Amino acid sequence: AAIGLYQQDGAGNLARAETVFGLKYFLSSQSAILWMSMLFFMSTAFYWLGMFARGEGHTMSLIGSRLAWVAVGMALIGTLVRWYESYLIGPDIGHIPVSNLYEVFVMFCWMTAAFYLYYEQQYGTRALGGFVMLVVSAAVGFLLWYTVVREAHEIQPLVPALKSWWMKLHVPANFIGYGTFALAAMVAFAYLIKQQASETRWYKLAPLWLLGVVLCFEPIVFRQGAAETGGGYWMVYFGISALIVAGILMGRKRIAERLPSFEILDDVMYKSIAVGFAFFTIATVLGALWAAEAWG
C-alpha cells in the first residue's frame, strides 16, 4: 500500500512523501520509523505499569505486548519502504537498508522485540517485557539522537566496499546475534533482580544498579565517540537510566513475585545465547568471505 502511494503517472515519485497524507504522517520510511519509536516507548511503559498494577496488571501488560507487535510491524514497513525509496533516488543508489547505524538500529530494535515476543508466546508470560523493552527503548533513544545530530535518516549512496550481496547476509546475521544477546542480558538482569529480592544491604545492591545502568548504555558501544559528540544528551540519558534502574531495585520484591520461575529464566537465557552464537558464527564466516572478495 505504501509503495502504491508513491506512484504517479505509472512511475514512483519520492517527492510524494511530503505531499500525500498517508505517506507524510504514516507510511514513508521516516514516518513509519518514528511511529515505531513511539510505540516501543509506549510498550515499555505499559509493560511496567502491568508489572506494578494491582487489579489491571494483565490488561496493561497485554496492551504492552500488542503495542510491541505493532511497533515491529511499523519497523518492517519502514525498512521495506526505505529500500524502495533508495531506488527512487536512483537505480545505482538503491540498496538494502542495512548500511549505516540508523538502518541497523531499526533492525536491532525489531529483531530484539520479535525474538522476545516469540518467547513470550512460548512461555506464556509477559513479565519479562518491561526488561527487554528497556534495552529496545535505549536503542530507540540512540536512534533518535543519531537522527537529529547526524541526519542519519537521509539515504546515502553506498561506499564501494559495501556494494556487495554479502552485505545482505552478513549484517542481518550479525544483528540477529546482537538482538538475542541483548535479550539474554536483560533476562539475566531480571534473574538477578529476582535472586536479590530479599536483599536489604545497599552495598550488595549497588553492583546490580551499576549493571542495570551499563546495560542501558549498550547502544554507545556501536558508535565510537558517541558520548563525546552529544554530552548534554547523554548526561540526561544517564540520569533517566539511573533513576529507572533505581526504581526497579526499589520495587524488586513486587517484580520478583511477577517474574517467572528461575528455570524459565534460565531456559530463555540459554536459548537466546545459543541462537546468538549460531548467527554470530555465521556472520563471522560471511564477513571473512566478504572481506576476501572486497580486498583480497
Report each predicted region and the residues it spans.
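Hydrophobic cores of alpha-helical transmembrane segments in multi-pass integral membrane proteins
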Residues: A1-T19, F26-I155, L162, L169-A256, ...
